[in-house]
From Swiss-Prot:
Pfam families: ATP-synt_DE_N (PF02823). Keywords: ATP synthesis, Cell membrane, CF(1), Hydrogen ion transport, Ion transport, Membrane, Transport. Residues 103-124 are annotated as: Disordered. Belongs to the ATPase epsilon chain family. This is ATP synthase epsilon chain. It is a peripheral membrane protein. InterPro entries: ATP_synth_F1_dsu/esu, ATP_synth_F1_dsu/esu_N, ATPsynth_dsu/esu_N.
Length: 146
């Protein structure tokens, strides 16, 4: 049987820390082509990962993380996901996430109308914060959070 005796490993990494580093039976993420589920002996993949959730299952245990955008790679039974932010669903504070969204939207409204390089970059960064906040709320409501 394919994969017999083999194990899939997953690493979920942010610039600050390694969020998850261990065995997995199934890793699910949203990449450029849509949602992907990876099990042992999966074919190699390199892609971007979108603001969504990453679900890591091992046995009866499932861990869910709200993530920002980043990169996704599968090779040799190792899934590597590199993102700016990854928060366990159980640790998400919905009120705090909603506050982050409101604050970022206020900042967007205060940006100058002209589109010079600095304001374009600021608009992109603030828009990313809004998307992350919205994703935190979505994941907390779907998978449990505070």
């Amino acid at each position: 049987m394919a994969g017999e005796g083999r194990q899939l490993f997953c690493r979920l990494i942010t610039p600050e820390r390694v969020v998850y580093d261990g065995e997995a039976d199934l890793v699910v993420a949203k990449i450029a082509d849509g949602e992907i589920g990876v099990m042992v002996d999966h074919y190699p993949v390199i892609s971007t990962v979108d603001f969504w959730d990453v679900r890591i299952t091992r046995g009866e245990e499932r861990r869910v993380y709200a993530t920002s955008d980043g990169f996704f790679k599968v090779a040799d039974n190792l899934v590597q996901i590199l993102v700016e932010e990854a928060v366990p669903a159980s640790e998400i504070n919905v009120e705090e996430a909603e506050h982050r969204i409101e604050q970022a939207e206020r900042e967007l409204g205060q940006l100058p109308e002209e589109e010079d390089e600095d304001s374009r970059r600021a608009r992109e960064e603030i828009s990313r914060r809004v998307r992350l906040g919205e994703n935190l709320v979505r994941v907390a409501r779907r998978y449990g959070g505070g």
